Amino acid sequence: MEATKKLNGKAVTKWLSNNAIIMMMLAITLIVGIMHPNFFSGTNMINLFKNVSIRYIIALGISGCLITTGNDLSAGRLAGFAACLACIFAQTEGASGKFYPNMHTMPTLVVFILVIAICAIIGLCNGLVVSYLKVQPFIATLGMQQVVYGICLVYTGGTPIGSLNKNFTSLASNTIIGIPVLIWIALVVAVCFWFLYNKTRHGKYMYAIGGNEAAAEVAGVNVHATKIRIYILASCMFGLAGCLLAAKSGGASVNTAMGYELDAIAACTIGGVSTTGGVGTVPGVLVGVLVFELMKVALQFMNVNSSYTYIVQGLVIIVAVAIDIRKYLAKK
């Protein structure tokens, strides 16, 4: 009986330790919700989940990289580049300051396909550099981050792009059975990722590489091809998120989505995706993104200066990764 109590006590302590950040953030959110009833209002929650939807898609893209002990620091800049491209392709005809005055406005579906295809090429470059040139993902994607930002600056001249077609922007405002289309898109993406991670050979290979890359290669896993697919898929998600962000904002600039990669990495880590590889789930990523976004909105309701918000976010990232490393060392 005493042994059972000790075991249960250890299990509870371990659970609290592993989920300390989530519990702390939820507690802060609850307190803010009690102090400010508008926090849990329908309008605020809808806006929150719209933001979560876009962040979730980016985090899902990065999750595959993290599970294979990699990373993708080009996420934010690539999403911003995608947003700028989407805005250029979706600008209304005859708009003042139109990027390409003689270009017809493209259909929304064509805009998405074209932007995602361009991002896929960038993801292919990342995958090739990481898998074949053996460059550390951190360095490879950091370099690509700067390359993409530079291309975006040269291409747009640093000029904000707006005057978008209503068919394109309505994607962010339309609803299906009362639920915003953005949320439906994120749900469809999440279901596809869950199936990919849990029911396909690619998912099994991905977790095997994250657990022990050398052993996976000996077992016959094509490590190079798997990693390339992961980085291509990640970039496609950044492209999709960039298009949705452009539709939601009604425009874009070179600074759109800046820093989103750090938020996504933090959300993944909070949601149980291990930076040491081999561990991570699609629902866990959703929990991480939701908790992280709730914290940011709660800080805004508390009238915390935006400068201090960055400090809090940075501390959360450090603590989340530290806890993840601690769990990894405990297993060893």
Q: Over which residues does each language-model region extend?
A:
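Alpha-helical transmembrane segments within multi-pass membrane transporters and channels
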Residues: 94-145, 287-288
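Helix-loop-helix "hairpin" substructures at the membrane interface of multi-pass membrane proteins
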Residues: 107-115, 122-126, 178-252
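Cytosolic-side transmembrane-helix boundaries in multi-pass membrane proteins
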Residues: 1-24, 28, 218, 222-225, ...
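Transmembrane alpha-helical segments in multi-pass inner-membrane proteins
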Residues: 238, 248-314
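Inter-helical junctions in multi-pass inner-membrane proteins, predominant
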Residues: 37-51, 153, 197, 203, ...
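Transmembrane helix-bundle core of multi-pass membrane transporters
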Residues: 133, 137-200, 226-229, 247-258, ...
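Single transmembrane alpha-helix segments in multi-pass membrane proteins
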Residues: 31-35, 39-93, 128-135, 272-282, ...
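Membrane-interfacial amphipathic/re-entrant helices at transmembrane-helix boundaries
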Residues: 2-60, 95-110
